[in-house]
A protein has these predicted regions:
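Contiguous transmembrane helix-bundle modules in multi-pass membrane proteins
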Residues: 1-76, 85, 89-246
């Protein structure tokens, strides 16, 4: 709760600092805008919704155990997948959700303030240089980096996935040859590509170079298609040919 309150309070301070420039440009006295009250209310609501999930994952991680047996793919103790990994995933997902919420909050605060106090509208040039745009872009970059992080963590799920169904109905779980060779490194590279392409697209968007924005963003689906084709070809040519002998 304390962390949420502090984060909301600081975010609102930056919002008020950005709005102050519009009031100064319009030669208006800036009214007293809500901060402490709205920070308290938002923090209470978010804490009530998310506290149970975080407490459960935290207690699971703190009370975890090590089995002394490492998986052959990542050389990590089996206990990590049962106790620490769910906690790490929960933290990243929580962070993404929080950044999305704050992005909506920032946009809503500005829009409501603009509609209430600036009947004549605002200068687009001032808006582009304002803290508002910087806050939104910063949050988007943080969300992108968090998505990359969760992608890297989720790659480890190949160890627990189903990879073979036997004729007697029994399913075997673990990592197949494609999983440990192509998928692991393919998705690790994909996480890096997401970050680089998204950040470069944002930079070019700020420069209004929209052709490069499309170029950088199109790299992501192109890479996914290429990865799918590599997996398909590898499966047809190498795995299906004689998987048991490999």
């Amino acid at each position: 709760f304390a962390v949420l309150y502090l984060a909301t309070y600081i975010t609102t301070r930056f919002i008020k600092r950005g709005l102050k420039k519009f009031f100064e440009e319009d030669k208006k006295e800036m009214p007293k805008l809500p901060n402490k009250s709205i920070s308290l209310i938002l923090s209470i609501i978010v804490s009530m919704i998310t506290s149970n999930m975080l407490i459960e994952k935290t207690m699971l991680a703190l009370n975890g155990a090590y089995f002394g047996v490492n998986d052959p793919v990542f050389n990590v103790d089996i206990g990590y997948y049962m106790f620490q990994k769910p906690f790490i995933e929960a933290l990243i997902i929580y962070f993404i959700g929080l950044m999305v919420l704050y992005t909506i909050y920032i946009a809503a605060y500005y829009i409501i303030s603009f509609n209430k106090y600036f009947e004549k509208g605002i200068d687009p040039a001032t808006l582009k240089k304002n803290t508002f745009v910087k806050q939104i872009i910063t949050n988007i970059v943080l969300i992108i980096l968090a998505v990359s992080a969760i992608t890297i963590v989720k790659v480890q799920d190949v160890v627990c996935g189903k990879f073979l169904n036997l004729s007697n109905g029994i399913s075997l779980y673990g990592a197949g040859l494609i999983d440990v060779t192509i998928k692991v490194w393919g998705y690790r590279i994909f996480a890096v590509i997401i970050s680089v392409c998204a950040i470069m697209a944002i930079r070019n968007f700020k420069k209004e170079n929209f052709k490069k924005v499309i170029g950088w963003l199109s790299t992501i689906p192109i890479y996914l298609i290429a990865l799918f084709l590599v997996i398909l070809i590898f499966d047809l040519v190498y795995i299906n040919k004689n998987e048991l002998d490999k």
